[in-house]
Amino acid sequence: MRIAFLGTPAFAVAALDALERAGHALVTVVAQPDRPAGRGQALREPATKAWARARGVPVLQPEKVRDGTLAAALRALAPDALVVAAYGRILGKDLLTLAPHGALNVHGSLLPRWRGAAPIQWAVAEGERETGVTIMQMDEGLDTGDVLLQRALEIGEDDTSETLAPRLAALGGEALVEALRLLEAGALVPVRQDAAQATLARILEKEDGRIAWTRPARRISDRLRGFTPWPGAFTTLEGRTLKVLEARPGADVATPAGEPGEAEVVPGRGLAVACGGGSALLVTRVQLEGRPAQSALDLANGLRRKRFRLGT
């Protein structure tokens, strides 16, 4: 097939690799514009743009996608289908309907669960044990189109959104190629989503990473895993931000007496922090504002205290 591909970050590159291996003709790659990144705020090109440039595939980076200009440019390339993977923009009807096979989306969840911009992060943060990828026929709603094909994937107890994303991306590439094969053969049966089962994976905000110690330790641990690497998990210690980098539910450690947020040294292991429901979180690695990352024990040694309160 002649494919016009719309995608921006590293997650989308696995789909490009799969399309290339399957012999599909990529007529263009559409990515978001280069953006400032890093401490120096130098312009950084999207991962998909780098992939395309290395192979001589034409790249488009429009600032606007709903003024008709992009639709006209793609229509001139006569693609058989649009493939969208983490592009990061909402597409209008003119784009969704310009190709004979419409627009197919590679989405990082088992729709209708986790519609929206951060499906991988929220699936982990909410403690789910299974997720997957969906190949969807796009419509004008937010991930509301008919499901064409799905593949499931287990979420491991130690998975973070960062470790899970590459596996989902690879699975998405495989599912995409299979869906295109079935589409060409006329063997795909679109399935309407059950809106009653939908959950929203809204865009993450910095404040989502703030730890509420009144939550059970398992819930705090899940959110730490889901929000790694951003926004991470953080609390405060005597008015300074304290990032919690590594932690797990401390089923085998005593819960410190007192209110949620009370922290106590567990010799040789880390800090046990009292959480909701009488549970404890064993914190092993942290970063105090203005300091490099360190073990939780080193933090306590530096403070010369065995017990202190977090969230203050």
From Swiss-Prot:
It comes from the Bacteria. It catalyses: L-methionyl-tRNA(fMet) + (6R)-10-formyltetrahydrofolate = N-formyl-L-methionyl-tRNA(fMet) + (6S)-5,6,7,8-tetrahydrofolate + H(+). Coiled coil: none annotated. PROSITE patterns: GART. GO terms for molecular function: methionyl-tRNA formyltransferase activity. (6S)-5,6,7,8-tetrahydrofolate binds at residues 109-112. Its EC number is 2.1.2.9. GO terms for cellular component: cytosol. Keywords: Protein biosynthesis, Transferase. The keyword Transmembrane does not apply. The keyword Protein biosynthesis applies. SUPFAM superfamilies: FMT C-terminal domain-like, Formyltransferase. Attaches a formyl group to the free amino group of methionyl-tRNA(fMet). The formyl group appears to play a dual role in the initiator identity of N-formylmethionyl-tRNA by promoting its recognition by IF2 and preventing the misappropriation of this tRNA by the elongation apparatus. HAMAP family: Formyl_trans. NCBIfam families: fmt. Belongs to the Fmt family. This is Methionyl-tRNA formyltransferase. It comes from Anaeromyxobacter dehalogenans (strain 2CP-1 / ATCC BAA-258). The gene is fmt.
